[in-house]
Curated annotation (Swiss-Prot):
<feature type="binding site">
    <location>
        <position position="12"/>
    </location>
    <ligand>
        <name>glutathione</name>
    </ligand>
</feature>
<dbReference type="GO" id="GO:0009635">
    <property type="term" value="P:response to herbicide"/>
</dbReference>
<comment type="function">
    <text>Conjugation of reduced glutathione to a wide number of exogenous and endogenous hydrophobic electrophiles. Involved in the detoxification of certain herbicides.</text>
</comment>
<feature type="domain" description="GST C-terminal">
    <location>
        <begin position="89"/>
        <end position="219"/>
    </location>
</feature>
<dbReference type="GO" id="GO:0004364">
    <property type="term" value="F:glutathione transferase activity"/>
</dbReference>
<comment type="similarity">
    <text>Belongs to the GST superfamily. Phi family.</text>
</comment>
<keyword id="KW-0808">Transferase</keyword>
<dbReference type="Pfam" id="PF02798">
    <property type="entry name" value="GST_N"/>
</dbReference>
<dbReference type="GO" id="GO:0006749">
    <property type="term" value="P:glutathione metabolic process"/>
</dbReference>
<dbReference type="InterPro" id="IPR004045">
    <property type="entry name" value="Glutathione_S-Trfase_N"/>
</dbReference>
<dbReference type="InterPro" id="IPR036282">
    <property type="entry name" value="Glutathione-S-Trfase_C_sf"/>
</dbReference>
<dbReference type="GO" id="GO:0032991">
    <property type="term" value="C:protein-containing complex"/>
</dbReference>
<comment type="subunit">
    <text>Homodimer.</text>
</comment>
<dbReference type="InterPro" id="IPR004046">
    <property type="entry name" value="GST_C"/>
</dbReference>
<dbReference type="InterPro" id="IPR010987">
    <property type="entry name" value="Glutathione-S-Trfase_C-like"/>
</dbReference>
<dbReference type="Pfam" id="PF00043">
    <property type="entry name" value="GST_C"/>
</dbReference>
<protein>
    <recommendedName>
        <fullName>Glutathione S-transferase 3</fullName>
        <ecNumber>2.5.1.18</ecNumber>
    </recommendedName>
</protein>
Amino acid sequence: MAPLKLYGMPLSPNVVRVATVLNEKGLDFEIVPVDLTTGAHKQPDFLALNPFGQIPALVDGDEVLFESRAINRYIASKYASEGTDLLPATASAAKLEVWLEVESHHFHPNASPLVFQLLVRPLLGGAPDAAVVEKHAEQLAKVLDVYEAHLARNKYLAGDEFTLADANHALLPALTSARPPRPGCVAARPHVKAWWEAIAARPAFQKTVAAIPLPPPPSSSA
C-alpha cells in the first residue's frame, strides 16, 4: 500500500492530532509540507485538496479528506484492525462522544492559541502576546478543572482504555513540557498529570513529537 500523505506543518495542533492517530495505527505516511507563511495553503494545488484552505488534508489513495477530527474518525474506522483500537467496544460510546466534543469545543479553543503564542511565534522570530497567553491560560485552567474531576473517576476519558478521545489531545503534553502556559497548570492537577504522562509515554506520541520542531523545555515544571 502506498503511504498516506498528510499535508500541513508539523507544529500545527491539527496536523499533530492526525499524525498521532496515524502513528497509533502504525500506518506508513509522509508529511507533505504546506508553508502557511508563504500562503501555500491558499494556492490552487492545495485548494484542490481542501477548498477552505486550511491544514491538514489527507490523501489515502483516491480518498481526499480534510478537517482533522473527521480524518481521525476515518482512520480509526477504516483501519480498525491495525495498531491501537481507538474505538474499542469496551469503552463507553457515550463518554467517547462527549469527550470528543469537549476537546473540540472547550479544550482546543483555549489550547490552540497557547500553542501558537508559546511555540509557533517564537519559532517565527516573534514574541508571545502576554495578554492572549493569560486569557487562554486562565480559561484552559478552568477546563482542566473539569478534566481533573472526570479523570479522578476514569483512567482515560472514555473509561479504562486509551481511545480516540485521548489521542485527539496529543499536542498538549508537548506544550506543557516545552512552554507551560502557567506554572502548575498540569502539576497541580494530579489526575490530569497522570493522564498527560500516560499519553506522553506512548510510543506513537513520542514518534509524533520527535518530528515537531519544539523549542527546548524550560527548567521549571508544568
